[in-house]
Amino acid sequence: MYRARAARAGPEPGSPGRFGILSTGQLRDLLQDEPKLDRIVRLSRKFQGLQLEREACLASNYALAKENLALRPRLEMGRAALAIKYQELREVAENCADKLQRLEESMHRWSPHCALGWLQAELEEAEQEAEEQMEQLLLGEQSLEAFLPAFQRGRALAHLRRTQAEKLQELLRRRERSAQPAPTSAADPPKSFPAAAVLPTGAARGPPAVPRSLPPLDSRPVPPLKGSPGCPLGPAPLLSPRPSQPEPPHR
């Protein structure tokens, strides 16, 4: 029944099947009738679907625009806070660069070599002052009571500066020695080996030294070594050495 109704209703307006049943003259008249052609296009399903999609996109864009406008104050506040942070960062970077420059100047001024030069200058100044005080005392321009305390302070200061300069020089020498690279193995001199490690045993030992005076032989008979024929003899018993007796004088 539904199929029969659809067949009686005919094709949908704007569908290719509806234009296919029209004659050439009707199609020409339809092309010349723009309002009717526009109405046919608007009644087509494809156009209505595109219209619905357009309305949905417009509604979505409108919602996003409202949300963006609501977040705009927060964006402006964030930009202002970011600008403040950048300004603070710039000030911190400038302060850091200034402090680094002052630190480098201080390190150069108070380096060990500069401190050594300052100590040597102080030592020379203290010794020069002591010599001037001695000359004033010898010329009678200064009394002994005023000379002794000042001279003692000057000599103590000179001794302190000399000790500090010597200790600092020793420290600098140690640092320079530790900074020098270790010598390579190629520069090491060849090691000398003992003759016993190179020559054979007999050649290394050489002939035994003959004592000048031999002790008298023992009069006791030596017991024969025990052993079975065909078997090697066991270790020979060692005799304890007897104290050497002086030889009788020659007659």
Curated annotation (Swiss-Prot):
Secretion signal, residue range per the UniProt entry: none
Keywords: Endosome, Membrane, Protein transport, Transport, Williams-Beuren syndrome
Skewed-composition ranges (Pro residues): 221-251
PROSITE patterns, per the entry: VPS37_C
UniProt disease annotation: VPS37D is located in the Williams-Beuren syndrome (WBS) critical region. WBS results from a hemizygous deletion of several genes on chromosome 7q11.23, thought to arise as a consequence of unequal crossing over between highly homologous low-copy repeat sequences flanking the deleted region.
Stated role: Component of the ESCRT-I complex, a regulator of vesicular trafficking process. Required for the sorting of endocytic ubiquitinated cargos into multivesicular bodies. May be involved in cell growth and differentiation.
Protein name: Vacuolar protein sorting-associated protein 37D
Organism: Homo sapiens (Human)
